[in-house]
């Protein structure tokens, strides 16, 4: 089996994402990855992550795999919880206030900080539009975050999300 076939198998089993670590474990060398990238067979989306050229990649999954601290929140969580129909231009993530993210991740998303002991509160897994499961906050935590950070959120997003949540039959008021 040649390198591209191995990478197709990896891609199929990992929601379209090929990580260098996984490719190396399967016998594909870094030189092969570089050559396939130059030949246009695969595309590098970030350090250590590739996709097959003909496929779209899941940005949220890519971000999540680059840091285990990331939990999608605010506008991104509104979208994942189906409170908002609008895809956010920039993904919003929350991390513990005692931690930092790499510059490459920080440049791609809006970062919110929270006390370490509150970081895991309301954490759940939901599917992205591409079907990958990512960590995000549940509806109730998301609404609390939106209210807490309303000065950093567009007025239209704030008001529509509160109205949408209030009219939702899935809210948990207990």
PLM features: what roles do these ranges have?
Residues 4-6, 16-22, 37, 49-174:
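Nucleic-acid-binding surface
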Residues 40-47:
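A short, conserved structural fragment
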Residues 2-6, 28-31:
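N-terminal amphipathic/basic helix or basic patch
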Residues 25-38:
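Short amphipathic alpha-helical interaction segments
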Residues 10, 23-24:
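Residue-level marker of alpha-helix boundaries and capping positions
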